[in-house]
Amino acid sequence: MISSPSTSTASASSSKSATSDLFDQSALSALAQRLVEAAKRAGADAADAVAVRNISQGVEVRDGRVEESERSEGDDVGLRVLVGRRQAVVSTNDVSGDGVAKLAERAVAMARVAPDDKYVGLADPSLLARDFPDLDLLDPKVPSTSELERRACEAEAAALAVKGVTKSGGASASTGIGGMVLVTSTGSHGSYLRSSQGISMTAIVGDGTGMERDYDYTSAPHASDLASPAKVGRTAGERTVARANPRKVETCKVPVVFDPRVSNSLVGHLVGAVNGASIARKTSFLKDRLGEQLFAKNIRIIDDPLRVRGLRSQSFDAEGVKVKKLAIIDEGVLTSWLLDSATARELGLVTTGHAHRGVSSSPSPGSYNLHLEAGEPTPAELISDIAQGFYVTDLIGSGVNGVTGDYSRGASGFWIENGEITYAVSEVTIAGHLFEIFKSLAPANDLEFRYGVNAPTLRIEGLTVGGR
């Protein structure tokens, strides 16, 4: 599955020399163009097509030996057709001449019997992207299988070197390149090439019912932006050892502090609630809150599709619409929904350029590189006045109601006493309401851009920690 175009045809072509043995973007472009032309011949009033090629390779090791090494490669195409206000989406991996023609005919036949939807349609041509910045998403160096094995083994060795780690849960290293072309019957055309690199490690302490495990990982388009394998392994080992011999706590209402590894989930809940599809269906607890103060005035939450080397960067969306940096929360105020063309029409607004799609699905709203801006206090200062509190490092389950805003999740982490992180805690729940969570949220100054959604350490007042 793909998201949407992320660099211009020009920038994709300029990178081709480094990957000419792996990719032929001109062939993908021609394929997408044939799909659109075939749809028009079959009777579609409008159409768009995506053609995708992905190549990936991964190595998994345990106890210094390769357990699995695999490589995958594939082409997929997706076609969306419109007959009047009726829409159908089809996909296939049969990219032969007959396959393309049959796919177009099937799509048009499906659209003719689909229900009318007055909100469907291609994007307004006046909103399409014209300028395509180079976001530097393609690493020209493709690591070999032996290099991937070296990275995984180094991460595992570093974890096992941490005192207290008893065994390896496995380490892995991966690489991949994805290419995608979008063509529409209105003349929009764009493509991208994007690389991906990753290293992960899981460590274990104890055994039987006393076993604890933890992990670390790093991912980026460029290998030079990855954390070192040794750091990944060492962090996984240290986190695992710290979790040993967890205690239970009594149910109480205390400040809860979210480690950056999990604090981004709170941003994710906000973004789910401002998704245009949820707003249009009236299934979001924020449906009537646009323009209201939800957070403290020092809080800004940014969606930035144009971050250089960002994990989710792209210069136009899945409908070809121009994208831009957007402050969803500015000085604590909710400023915007995330919209594609269809949800924008339904709400009487203009798309914000947030359309995403897979080859087998129609466009729908999604986000890019999200982050909650850092505050001023250090993490230590943020917890220094907490007499009793809970520091969360892992969340379990998904007990969050997007309609009501009720929040309840399983968690593990560490107990805070007199401003210090003390012993490990497991098997608790944390509960509250997202309105109250947003209102009291206070950030530390340790923001790092490691994931698609990023936030610093966050402190929330008065959540219920359910224990014994």
Short names for language-model regions:
Residues 1-468:
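N-terminal small-residue-enriched
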